[in-house]
């Protein structure tokens, strides 16, 4: 088995277009997700198909989903967990229908990737995620409805 080159794409708002990604030698696979749906809601087939079609138009394959967000109530074992798990499973089935072969998952306790800023500028001009403790320390995930960037 060979390692497959894949590239993360954040959808139409990503400053790097699929056209640019397709120019990377050996790049065939896109890792993406439906970003405009809250955790615990079903992804529309239209949104998934659009991702696939956009990739196809650029000679790329949308076959990896970077995490269908896990609702906090699943992690905390509260609320209507069975319904939320059904929604999660339905999202997996819908992705499979449109050719997705791999769904990464993130069951990090309480918060997903903990960060407070998505574009921290480094000295070399690159950007990365960053978490500032001062912005996080007053949050209580058991009491507050918290959404990080």
State where each predicted segment sits.
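Glycine-rich, proline-tolerant flexible connector loops at the mouths of alpha/beta enzymes
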Residues: 33-49, 111
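Active-site-proximal loop/turn and secondary-structure-junction residues that shape catalytic pockets
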Residues: 11-13, 36, 68-69, 107-111
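Active-site acidic/histidine proton-transfer and metal-coordination neighborhood
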Residues: 74-149
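Structural motif
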Residues: 24-25, 98
